[in-house]
Design a protein with these regions (language model features):
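S-adenosyl-L-methionine
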Residues: 1-134, 138, 266-274
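Conserved acidic-Pro-Pro-aromatic motif
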Residues: 48, 191-274
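Short, glycine/acidic-enriched loop or turn micro-motifs at the edges of active sites
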Residues: 99-101, 125, 152, 209-211, ...
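Short, conserved active-site loop motifs that form the nucleotide-linked donor/cofactor pocket
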Residues: 116, 143-144, 203
Length: 274
């Protein structure tokens, strides 16, 4: 059986998908399954698949079958999807910061149509390429793709690109002294304030930047002072939690955690008290 047959079986058979998901949660079985997938499926393989359920049902995505099959079930970061859907209305301007391969941007763009705006921010060139493919395949070309890192300053930053198996292929911004690996590249950076002044003020922001959340917010002072958007933010460690929550409280926001677990990463929902 070749790797395409393996992918086809796992992606089309609901019983097989459920067995595969459950088995992955058992240490010994999960390890065996991962070893099998590594042997059967090339690490850089990409196949077109349609999301089967949830808010993204029917959307086509170009995914890596070894590491990204969870997107197909339609419940990846379900709490974020619920917040997104309940706050998409005519006139919404959505900033997807750390868009990865653009799934949330696609969901937002399809729901808003011409009645809103979607901006996808992503510094990794390979992910940017996939966002463009997804927008084209799903006829959602109105998504504005900003191929830059979002930070507290406009300029250039070092970005550590991730492999597929590393945190769902999400890279991180790194200090210059740490950016010595071959996979580290230099990328343009921009503040959200700069984008808002040039284009449109956001009403809804999603942030997932692997630990650089505070820097994103520091470059968004004008937005949170004047536009006061709803914020959904993935927090990756205790220090980021402290920095982000303090920053929000000082600007008149209240927040709640979307998951009951206290383990990181976890998602924060913040709304303006006024």
């Amino acid at each position: 059986m070749n790797w395409m047959s393996v992918v086809q079986q796992l992606s089309t058979s609901l019983p097989l998908r459920k067995i595969y998901t459950l088995a992955n949660r058992v240490p010994i079985l999960g390890s065996a399954l991962r070893n099998f997938s590594r042997a059967a499926i090339p690490s850089d393989a990409l196949v077109w698949k349609s999301i089967r359920s949830g808010p993204g049902k029917g959307l086509w995505i170009h995914l890596n079958p070894r590491y990204e099959m969870k997107y197909l079930e339609g419940d990846y970061e379900a709490s974020v999807e619920r917040i997104l859907l309940s706050n998409l209305r005519p006139g919404t301007v959505f900033y997807d910061v750390g868009a990865h391969i653009g799934v949330f941007s696609l969901i937002a763009a399809r729901n808003l149509g011409v009645q809103g705006s979607v901006f996808a921010f992503e510094p990794d060139p390979s992910n940017v390429r996939r966002i463009k493919e997804h927008a084209s395949r799903n006829q959602l070309d109105a998504i504005r793709i900003i191929p830059k890192a979002v930070s507290c300053t406009d300029g250039r930053l070092r970005f550590q690109r991730a492999s597929f198996q590393s945190s769902m292929n999400r890279g991180v911004l790194v200090e210059e002294t740490l950016a010595l690996q071959e996979s580290a590249i230099e990328v343009d950076s921009i503040t959200l304030d700069a984008v808002a002044r040039e284009h449109a003020w956001p009403t809804l922001i999603k942030i997932d930047v692997e630990g650089s959340e505070a820097a994103v917010l520091q470059g968004s002072e004008e937005i949170f002072r004047f536009a006061k958007p709803l914020l959904v933010c993935e927090i990756h460690h205790e220090q980021a939690s402290s920095d982000v929550t303090r920053w929000l409280l000082e600007r008149g926001y209240k927040f709640q955690w979307l998951e009951s677990s206290t383990e990181f990463p976890r998602h924060l929902l913040a709304t303006y008290l006024g």
